[in-house]
Amino acid sequence: MPAPYHDAMKITPIRHAHRRMRERRVSVADIRNVLNGRPPMHPSPNKRVQMGRTLDGRRLEVMYTEAKAGEVRVVSVVTP
């Protein structure tokens, strides 16, 4: 993964019109946790992808799953 991250990771989520109510936004902290190397998650059926932008205008795709307590686990972050 390219490394222009650390705290340049300020994401403005792109608004989606019909977002399911309980679906949480992926926060910058979630992403930072992943980039700082948490052990890889077990594969999960309900992965979701959120698109966002970094401040310098690159696109981001954040793939995440929801854990039990509504907590979000980010699986991968790509700048395609």
Predicted regions and their residues:
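Ribonuclease/tRNase effector modules and their secretory precursors
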Residues: 1-80
